[in-house]
Swiss-Prot record:
Protein family membership: Belongs to the RuvB family.
InterPro entries with a match to the protein in the record: AAA+_ATPase, P-loop_NTPase, RuvB-like, RuvB-like_C, RuvBL1/2_DNA/RNA_bd_dom, TIP49_P-loop
Compartments in which it is found: Nucleus
Gene Ontology biological-process annotations: box C/D snoRNP assembly; chromatin remodeling; DNA repair; regulation of transcription by RNA polymerase II; rRNA processing
One Pfam short name: TIP49
UniProt key word DNA repair: yes
PANTHER family in UniProt: RUVB-RELATED REPTIN AND PONTIN
GO molecular function annotations of the record: 3'-5' DNA helicase activity; 5'-3' DNA helicase activity; ATP binding; ATP hydrolysis activity
Residues annotated to bind ATP: 76-83
Protein name: RuvB-like helicase 2
Enzyme class name: hydrolase
Organism: Candida glabrata (strain ATCC 2001 / BCRC 20586 / JCM 3761 / NBRC 0622 / NRRL Y-65 / CBS 138) (Yeast)
Subunit details: May form heterododecamers with RVB1. Component of the SWR1 chromatin remodeling complex, the INO80 chromatin remodeling complex, and of the R2TP complex.
């Protein structure tokens, strides 16, 4: 994704492109074929074949509507693609299925209680497709006549509109005249008018006017003149989440809170009434419930009260699929004194189906770094890519991925568009990975403030520097 920003140092105020590249912006799906078999490298996903195959089964069940109120735990070491798996699932589901991503630490807030924050996250992940029949007037504009008063008072007008089979003249009031003026509707445009709201939508320009000698923009779209009756009934489907309905009904002008984010605590009575109404709409065929996915990253950060709430919420009538990710092994459950696998209570683990991820091999790391370099528009020499791959295997994939953009800046400093081995080595020396940083702190721990607030102030100013070439040879 790129946006245009102005350069403050440029007196001419020229615009430059700013690329917004996230850690998982290169992922467009799970990389599966029609039989749910994972490809080695596809749609930005590399390796983790068993985990992607399992996620593909979950994807198919979600699309068929045969799974809801289930808990899925993705467990594995750091930098093994757990969040990437969730993002791939989100992209594969498409826009029609709600997908809400939060982290475990987001639940704790001074404004909202833990249960309220979780409830809102749950209800954001449940979509409601509401069907509505509307009457539309669709046709090609033949002529627009607008009579304006000299004193600037009431305006009157006539709109002549036609299809291939009929032609009609409509009287226009102030609101319709303003709408036509706002949309810049001219003779030859194909428009759609919602009779209930008076909303005017410009569909395009008629093919009959395509040969007219007239100035038009590059985005002008030519469409066929509509056939049949002018007035048509059309079924429109609106997709909203349960949380949006909650906010709108929780207070006067509640829809404004959707934009400000100041939702506050929503009373349970409001939610009960909405649940009853949605159930009625479902029985009458007016609405369809779409169970979505709630992804909780770093789920081990939740405490025992949150886990207890999730256990109960999974059994609710309106429950989404909960996907959780953690990199913990046997660790203490927050809010308790006992240890459990992945830092989760055993009763929640019993309710979950668990997907495991494993460390990437060298070839997979190389493929991922190649994809990241393409996403960041960085040209790597083969030797530099091999060195980054080796660094990723010895340190971590995240560290090696971060070195790509740093090494690019070093290469640009010497006026080169290609990142060479020397650029990667300089970046490696400038920025420590976690293991070298830990060793540096251990060797100089007397100079840091400890738990008791004690520190040894050195007057010589000498500190042990981290070893430069422990993971690679940095000599040029």
């Amino acid at each position: 994704m790129s946006i245009q920003t102005s350069d403050p140092n440029d007196p001419n105020g020229s615009l430059k492109s700013l690329s917004l590249i996230a850690a998982h912006s290169h992922i467009t799906g799970l990389g599966l074929d029609d039989n749910l078999q994972p490809r080695a490298s596809s749609e930005g996903m590399v390796g983790q074949l068993q985990a992607r195959r399992a996620a593909g089964v979950i994807l198919r069940m979600i699309q068929n509507g045969s799974i809801a109120g289930r808990a899925i735990l993705v467990a594995g070491p750091p930098s093994t693609g757990k969040t990437a798996l969730a993002m791939g699932l989100s992209q594969s589901l498409g826009k029609d299925v709600p997908f809400t991503a939060i982290t475990g630490s987001e639940i704790f807030s001074l404004e909202l209680s833990k249960t309220e924050a979780l409830t809102q996250a749950f209800r954001k992940s449940i979509g409601i497709k509401i069907k509505e029949e509307t009457e539309l007037i669709e046709g090609e504009v033949v002529e627009i006549q607008i009579d304006r008063s000299i004193t600037g008072g009431h305006k009157q007008g006539k709109l002549t509109i036609k299809t291939t089979d009929m032609e009609t003249i409509y009287e226009l009031g102030n609101k319709m005249i303003d709408g036509l003026t706002k949309e810049k509707v001219l003779a030859g445009d194909v428009i759609s008018i919602d009779k209930a709201s008076g909303k005017i939508t410009k569909l395009g320009r008629s093919f009959a006017r395509s040969r007219d000698y007239d100035a038009m923009g590059y985005d002008t779209k030519f469409v066929q003149c509509p056939e049949g009756e002018l007035q048509k009934r059309k079924t429109v489907v609106h997709t909203v989440s349960l949380h949006e309905i909650d906010v709108i009904n929780s207070r006067t002008q509640g829809f404004l809170a959707l934009f400000t984010g100041d939702t506050g605590e929503i009373r349970s009575e409001v939610r009960d009434q909405i649940n009853t109404k949605v159930a009625e709409w479902k029985e009458e065929g007016k609405a369809e419930i779409v169970p979505g996915v709630l992804f909780i990253d770093e789920v081990h950060m939740l405490d025992i009260e949150c886990f207890s709430f999730i256990n109960r919420a999974l059994e609710d009538e309106f429950a989404p699929i909960i996907m959780m990710a953690t990199n913990r092994g046997i660790s203490k459950t927050r809010g308790t004194n006992y240890k459990s696998p992945h830092g989760l209570p055993l009763d929640l683990l019993d309710r979950s189906i668990i997907i495991t991820t494993s460390n990437y091999n060298e070839e997979e790391i190389k493929t991922i770094l190649t994809i990241r370099a393409q996403e960041e528009e960085v040209e790597l020499s083969p030797d530099a890519l091999d060195l980054l791959t080796k660094t990723g295997g010895e340190t971590s994939l995240r560290y090696s991925s971060n070195l790509i953009s740093v090494a690019q800046q070093i290469a640009l400093k010497r006026k080169s568009n290609t990142v060479e081995v020397a650029d990667v080595k300089k970046a490696y020396l400038l920025f420590l990975d976690s293991s070298r940083s830990v060793k540096f702190v251990q060797e100089n721990q007397d100079q840091y403030i400890d738990d008791n607030g004690k520190v040894i102030i050195s007057t010589s100013g000498e500190m042990t520097q981290p070893a430069d070439g422990e993971a690679m040879d940095t000599t040029e």
